């Protein structure tokens, strides 16, 4: 019965700890870069929400055969549909800048806007939302 312990191959405690510490350092490095990605997602979602709200206001004007409007303020925008007012506050760190659009966007009974123009949603990324006069078409573009 000869037992040879020295021929067993494996990792030492020092080698295992070294690999685990390198893996944890890499994970920390990866997860510290995620907040900017989250912030970019927040800006994209805010631009998408604003586009959807513009289209909702337009479609409601057509379906109810009444004028609807969106009012833009410094910290929020409001959808005014008949007697109903829906307030949408801007997320923290985001701002909405009216480039060529006035502080009020109205849709008539046929869904046509009273004015066309651009709105800029700014945060870690920048999105321009264009409302076209006449057709009322809404386009979102990342800058």
Curated annotation (Swiss-Prot):
Entry GO terms, CC: cell surface; plasma membrane; type II protein secretion system complex
Membrane-topology descriptor: Single-pass membrane protein
Chain positions with N-methylphenylalanine modification: 11
Alphabetical UniProt keywords: Cell membrane, Competence, Membrane, Methylation, Transmembrane, Transmembrane helix, Transport
Source organism, top-level taxon: Bacteria
Alphabetical list of InterPro entries matching this protein: ComGD, N_methyl_site, Pilin-like, T2SS_protein-GspH
UniProt xrefs under SUPFAM superfamilies: Pili subunits (SSF54523)
Residue ranges listed under propeptide: 1-10
Annotated TM spans: 11-31
Subcellular location as annotated: Cell membrane; Cell surface
Record Pfam families: N_methyl (PF07963)
Gene Ontology biological process terms, A to Z: establishment of competence for transformation; protein secretion by the type II secretion system
Record note on modification: Processing of ComGD in competent cells requires ComC.
Subunit structure: The transformation pili are flexible filaments, consisting mainly of the major pilin ComGC and smaller amounts of the minor pilins, including at least ComGD, ComGF and ComGG. Interacts with ComGF. Interacts with ComGG.
Function: Required for formation of the type IV-like pilus (T4P) that plays a role in transformation. Transformation pili are dynamically extended and retracted, perhaps thereby promoting DNA uptake and transformation. Required for transformation and DNA binding.
UniProt name for this protein: Competence protein ComGD
Organism annotation: Bacillus subtilis (strain 168)
């Amino acid at each position: 019965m000869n037992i040879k312990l020295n021929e067993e191959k494996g990792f030492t405690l020092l080698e295992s700890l070294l690999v685990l510490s390198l893996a944890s350092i890499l994970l920390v490095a990866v997860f510290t870069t995620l907040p900017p990605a989250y912030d970019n997602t927040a800006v994209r979602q805010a631009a998408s929400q604003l586009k959807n709200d513009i289209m909702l206001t337009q479609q409601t004007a057509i379906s109810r055969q009444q004028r609807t409007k969106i009012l833009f303020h410094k910290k929020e925008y409001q959808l005014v549909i008949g007697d109903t007012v829906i307030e949408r506050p801007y997320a923290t760190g985001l701002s909405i800048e009216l480039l060529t659009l006035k502080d009020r966007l109205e849709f008539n009974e046929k869904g046509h806007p009273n004015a066309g123009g651009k709105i800029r949603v700014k945060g870690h990324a920048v999105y321009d939302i264009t409302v076209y006069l006449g057709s009322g078409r809404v386009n979102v573009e990342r800058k």
